[in-house]
Amino acid sequence: MSNHYVDADGHVMEDADDILTFVKPPFHNRGTRNWMPSLDHFHTPADGTPRAPGTFDPTIGPEEWLQFLAQTGTEYTVLYPTTGLAFGNVAYPQWALAYAQAYNEYIHTRYLQRSPQLQAVALIPMQQVPEAVAELRRAVQDLGFVGAMLPSNGLTRHVSHPEYWPIYAEAERLNCMLAVHGGSYMNLGFNTYTVFPATRALGMPFPLAIAATGMIVDGVFDRFPQLRVGFMEGGTAWIPLVIDRLEREVAYGGLKLTRHPEEYFKDDRIFVGCEGNEKALAYAIERVGPKPFMFASDFPHEISIANCMEEINEVLERHDLKHEHKAAILGENARRFYGR
């Protein structure tokens, strides 16, 4: 197997001062304090949870990313934001538009123009759907983004609501991906947890399950048959849960679906980021096949270069996955999803 892997989900450590240089009037001279709302009140070092060496380094930029790709034998990465994971929590539509435009210009200038190994998803201001459609079009056609991120939390309506369907129609027309990315845990039932890792353990997969379930039952994948949507950084164990619960609702709860719940995961419509050491991965493949699953490094968040190599090797050395499954997970599926 080639060692040219694809990293389906890496992260930018945003430079707020640099992004400021791309902000248009009237917001450009308002300072950099509180650019982005907090992900939640859980992401704080005050709980005493230690961080591994080499993770969450704010100095990581395009050059460090290229070094990471070279050292891990990775063909390219697709970059998601860090503070921008809270983008759904932005309350002011005008600021959402201004920040999305500035962030996308920043990523285009600092990362995309630096190397084709650095791909990225755009931010789009879903607080104003017409502006989100226009920014998605600009990001993909003019700036070279592979698609855009959908917030996992914070929007005033569920991501499956028809209000957002013009965005899905435009993504389908552009033949670009969209992806829901976990990371914002507010109002998900974790407010009384006293240990942050417990919040993160459940706070990553549950918003993905909520988003995917809504998009299935509200008919998004039926209305837009060519739409590709990713669900990132929540692992794979939530997939059998969603399928089994929807099956029961179809059987006994009056839920009407055009297809069996499993079928939505089998036809290149839904893609899912995964880690190398997930025991649930083999069972998820047994249920829906290998096509949805994409290896994701999460660098430079909880993962260092050494951790990433360990997880790649864990995929390669697994005895419960076929050779063709490993090839799909480590590159083929991501290339198909991102169109690169």
Language-model regions: role of each:
Residues V6-A8, Q94, I124-E131, T156:
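Alpha-helical scaffold segments that form or flank carboxylate-/histidine-based iron centers
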Residues I60, P81-A102, T109-S115, P125, ...:
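Active-site-proximal, glycine-rich beta->alpha crossover segments in alpha/beta enzymes
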Residues T82, M126, G182-N187, N277, ...:
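Short glycine-enriched loops at secondary-structure junctions
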Residues S2-V6, D15-Y76, E105-Q113, A134-R138, ...:
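Mid-to-C-terminal alpha-helical segments outside catalytic/metal-binding sites
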Residues G48-G54, L66-V90, Q117-P125, V146-L150:
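Divalent metal-dependent hydrolysis catalytic cores, especially in the metallo-beta-lactamase
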Residues A96-Y103, S160-P166:
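Charged helix-capping and loop-helix junction motifs
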Residues A16-L20, V90-A91, F190-Y193, L241-R245, ...:
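Short aromatic-enriched loop/helix-cap "lid" or pocket-rim segments at secondary-structure transitions
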Residues L112-Q119, P130, E135-M294:
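Catalytic pocket-lining loop regions of alpha/beta-barrel enzymes
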